[in-house]
């Protein structure tokens, strides 16, 4: 497992400012342990998502 920003079908981060509950649900649906809105990144951040779940990386950024 690893931590990271989950991505949508376009490979973009999930935008998130203050809705931690929504982000936590999005992380759980991907098999993650916990999720919260990371203000610095303006995106949903997940902890302990399975390795097969795509997370955002600078190298593969298409947004």
UniProtKB/Swiss-Prot annotation:
Has the structural arrangement of an alpha-helix connected to antiparallel beta-sheets by disulfide bonds (CS-alpha/beta). It is found in: Secreted. Transmembrane segments: none annotated. This is Toxin Cn11. It comes from Centruroides noxius (Mexican scorpion). Keywords: Disulfide bond, Ion channel impairing toxin, Neurotoxin, Secreted, Toxin, Voltage-gated sodium channel impairing toxin. InterPro entries: LCN-type_CS_alpha_beta_dom, Scorpion_toxin-like, Scorpion_toxin-like_sf, Scorpion_toxinL, Scorpion_toxinL/defensin. The keyword Disulfide bond applies. Expressed by the venom gland. Disulfide bonds join 12-63, 16-37, 23-44, 27-46. GO terms for cellular component: extracellular region. Belongs to the long (4 C-C) scorpion toxin superfamily. Sodium channel inhibitor family. GO terms for biological process: defense response. Residues 2-63 form the LCN-type CS-alpha/beta domain. One of its GO terms (molecular function) is sodium channel inhibitor activity. First blocker of sodium channels (Nav) found in scorpions. Is lethal to crustaceans (Cambarellus montezumae), less toxic to insects (crickets) and non-toxic to mammals (mice) at the doses assayed. The keyword ATP-binding does not apply.
């Amino acid at each position: 497992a690893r931590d990271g920003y989950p991505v949508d079908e376009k490979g973009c981060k999930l935008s998130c400012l203050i809705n931690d509950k929504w982000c936590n649900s999005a992380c759980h649906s991907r098999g993650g342990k916990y999720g919260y809105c990371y203000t610095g990144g303006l995106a949903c951040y997940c902890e302990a998502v399975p390795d097969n779940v795509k997370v955002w990386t600078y190298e593969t950024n298409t947004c």
